[in-house]
Curated annotation (Swiss-Prot):
One of its GO terms (cellular component) is cytoplasm. GO terms for molecular function: L-methionine-(S)-S-oxide reductase activity; peptide-methionine (S)-S-oxide reductase activity. It comes from Xylella fastidiosa (strain 9a5c). Has an important function as a repair enzyme for proteins that have been inactivated by oxidation. Catalyzes the reversible oxidation-reduction of methionine sulfoxide in proteins to methionine. The lineage of its organism: Bacteria, Pseudomonadati, Pseudomonadota, Gammaproteobacteria, Lysobacterales. Its EC number is 1.8.4.11. One of its GO terms (biological process) is cellular response to oxidative stress. This is Peptide methionine sulfoxide reductase MsrA. Belongs to the MsrA Met sulfoxide reductase family. The keyword Oxidoreductase applies. The active site is at C54. The gene is msrA. It catalyses: L-methionyl-[protein] + [thioredoxin]-disulfide + H2O = L-methionyl-(S)-S-oxide-[protein] + [thioredoxin]-dithiol; [thioredoxin]-disulfide + L-methionine + H2O = L-methionine (S)-S-oxide + [thioredoxin]-dithiol. It comes from the Bacteria.
Length: 216
């Protein structure tokens, strides 16, 4: 069964009187690795949100890809505006840890991003990734276009067949369009593993190849 926000609502208690705020958290608007803006209109570039566990390792995974212009760690999919890391980790906001990926589709295809996403985590684990347990670690793809949504949905079906053959259970990845609001994480979480090369990275794939050929 594919998890949706509606199916997840009973797992958390949204209380905007206790958490969240009306203004964004302070942000240094410069990518620590690439030197590009973290927050911008990004005219002429495409955007997508991926959640595949702890955003520290996930963000590094994508900023290393040729054609990716910028990345940012953040929170999305919940009901509380401008949350903090502590609030998200409480499980009361409904948000997932996600990475905003800004890319040049003439250099890297959406297909390549999807392959990286599927092959870099275990999308069958529900509310966890490895030792990281909680609703914030669920697997998500938040699409900014209907074309992305169609491609992501098709890729999930294709990868499910591969996982079935390898003995895995059902994919629990939530795919949404339009993408919910993206809230930037605190400065200390941005490009964390570039600032702390020996820091924690909990990413771990299944070892199953995703053979999609969508050319999106």
């Amino acid at each position: 069964m594919v998890l949706t926000i509606e199916a997840l609502k009973h797992l958390w208690r949204l209380d905007e009187s206790r958490v969240g705020r009306s203004e964004p958290l302070p942000l240094d608007n410069r990518h620590y690795v690439k030197g590009h803006p973290l927050c911008d209109a990004f005219t002429g570039l495409a955007q997508i949100q991926f959640g595949l566990g702890c955003f520290w390792g996930a963000e590094r995974l994508f900023w290393q890809l040729p054609g990716v212009f910028s990345t940012a760690a953040g929170y999305a999919g919940g009901g509380v505006p401008y949350p903090t890391y502590r609030e998200v980790c409480s499980g009361e906001t409904g948000h997932a840890e996600v990475v905003l990926v800004v890319y040049d589709h003439t250099v890297i295809s959406f297909e390549q991003l999807l392959q990286t996403f599927w092959e870099s985590h275990d999308p069958t684990q529900g509310m966890r990734q490895g030792n990281d347990i909680g609703t914030q670690y669920r697997s998500v793809i938040h699409c900014t276009t209907s074309k992305q949504y169609a491609a992501a949905s098709t890729s999930r079906e294709v990868y499910q067949q591969q996982l079935n053959t390898a003995g895995y259970t059902a994919i629990t990845t939530e795919i949404l369009h339009p993408a919910p609001p993206f809230y930037y994480a605190e400065n200390e979480h941005q490009q964390y593993l570039a600032k702390h090369p020996n820091g924690y990275c909990g990413l771990g794939g299944t070892g199953v190849t995703c053979p999609i050929r969508l050319q999106v």
